[in-house]
C-alpha cells in the first residue's frame, strides 16, 4: 500500500471548485456525472489536456492556451474522437472555467471522452462528451521540490512503445502505464520514476519530460522513444536557446543518467524541477544545478507574466 504520508499529500493538493463545464453548459461540480457504462471508462478511449492559469500582474492568464487547445484537437483526431464543438467554444469554456470559479491560479483539465452507447471495442453509436474542470492545485511534486529537487528511481515498467500507441497525443488509456510507474516509485520511497523505452534508452518520467545536462550540453530523449511531445518541453528548449544552450534530441542510456551533471523534469503540472538522485545515487552535487535553476527561473518569470516575452505566451482569462 501507499506510504501514508504520501497518500495524505496527494489527496490534500486538490481543492474542489464550484462549477464544471460539461457538454456545453456549466453544472455544479457534484452534478458533473457520467454513466458507469461510458465507453471511455471501460476502454480508456479518451484524451485530455493539462493547462495552468496564474495570477499575473495584468490579471489571471493562461499559458500557451492555443497550443494546448490545438493539441487537444490533434489528440482527439488521432484517437478518432470527433469533438462536437469548435476550438473557439472550447477555448472560451477553458477561460470561463477559471473566471466563474473565481480562481486566480488554477490547473485546468479539458477531457474528451466517449459516453454510453453500444458496448465493445468499436465505438459505434457512441456520443463524444467534453468537459472542462478547473481547480486550485499546488506544486505537483511538492512545495519543496523547486528548491530541493526530487529523488527518483528507474522504473521496472517500460514506456509503451510508440508502435503501440501515439506518444504525441495525451490518451487516457496510456496513462495506466504511467500510473504503474508512479505507484511503484512512491511505494519504494521515491518522488517519481524514470521510464525506459525500447532499446534500453530513456523515454521520460512517469508524467514528465526529462532533460540531461553534461558539460553544458543539454539532451532530451526524442519522441520516437515514447516521450510525449510536451508543450513545456518545447518552451524549455526555447528558453535554453535564449540562454545560449543548444538542446539536442538524443538517446539517453542508464550510464548517461548516472554520469550527468544535471537532470531535470518538465511538464505543465511539474513545471521545471531538478532531479537530484537516481536509485539513491546523487546526480552532480546532489542539488538542482546552475543551468537547471537558470532555466527554471526564466520559465517562472515567463509564465508569471514578468518577462518581456510573456505576452507571446499568455492569454488573459477576462
Name each model-derived stretch.
Residues 113-118:
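Short, internal active-site loops enriched in acidic
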Residues 2, 98-101, 240:
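Hydrophobic, Leu/Ile/Phe/Ala-enriched alpha-helical segments that form helix-helix packing faces
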Residues 1-13:
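N-terminal amphipathic/basic-hydrophobic helices that include classical n-h-c signal peptides
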Residues 11-85, 89-96, 119-318:
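Helix-start/capping segments and mature chain N-termini
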Residues 99-106, 245:
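Short secondary-structure junctions
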Amino acid at each position: 500500500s501507499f506510504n501514508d504520508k504520501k497518500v495524505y499529500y496527494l489527496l490534500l493538493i486538490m481543492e474542489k471548485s464550484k462549477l464544471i463545464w460539461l457538454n456545453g453548459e456549466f453544472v455544479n461540480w457534484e452534478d458533473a456525472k457520467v454513466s458507469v457504462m461510458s465507453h471511455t471508462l471501460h476502454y480508456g478511449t479518451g484524451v485530455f489536456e493539462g493547462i495552468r492559469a496564474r495570477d499575473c500582474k495584468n490579471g489571471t492568464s493562461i499559458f500557451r492556451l492555443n497550443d494546448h487547445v490545438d493539441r487537444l484537437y490533434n489528440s482527439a483526431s488521432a484517437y478518432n474522437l470527433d469533438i462536437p464543438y469548435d476550438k473557439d467554444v472550447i477555448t472560451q469554456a477553458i477561460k470561463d472555467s477559471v473566471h466563474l470559479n473565481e480562481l486566480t491560479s488554477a490547473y485546468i483539465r479539458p477531457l474528451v471522452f466517449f459516453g454510453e452507447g453500444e458496448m465493445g471495442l468499436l465505438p459505434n453509436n457512441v456520443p463524444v462528451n467534453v468537459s472542462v474542470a478547473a481547480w486550485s492545485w499546488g506544486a505537483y511534486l511538492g512545495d519543496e521540490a523547486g528548491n530541493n529537487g526530487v529523488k527518483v528511481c528507474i522504473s521496472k515498467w517500460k514506456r509503451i512503445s510508440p508502435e503501440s500507441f501515439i506518444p504525441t497525443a495525451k490518451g487516457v488509456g496510456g496513462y495506466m502505464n504511467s500510473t504503474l510507474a508512479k505507484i511503484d516509485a512512491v511505494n519504494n520511497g521515491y518522488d517519481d520514476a524514470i521510464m525506459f523505452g525500447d532499446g534500453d534508452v530513456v523515454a521520460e518520467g512517469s508524467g514528465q519530460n526529462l532533460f540531461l545536462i553534461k558539460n553544458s550540453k543539454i539532451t532530451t530523449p526524442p519522441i520516437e522513444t515514447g516521450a510525449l511531445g510536451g508543450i513545456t518541453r518545447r518552451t524549455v528548449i526555447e528558453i535554453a536557446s535564449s540562454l545560449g544552450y543548444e538542446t539536442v534530441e538524443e538517446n539517453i542510456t542508464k550510464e548517461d543518467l548516472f554520469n550527468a551533471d544535471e537532470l531535470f523534469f518538465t511538464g505543465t503540472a511539474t513545471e521545471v524541477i531538478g532531479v537530484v538522485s537516481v536509485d539513491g545515487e546523487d546526480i552532480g552535487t546532489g542539488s538542482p544545478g546552475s543551468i537547471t535553476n537558470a532555466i527554471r527561473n526564466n520559465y517562472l518569470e515567463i509564465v508569471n507574466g514578468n518577462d518581456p516575452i510573456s505576452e507571446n505566451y499568455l492569454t488573459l482569462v477576462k
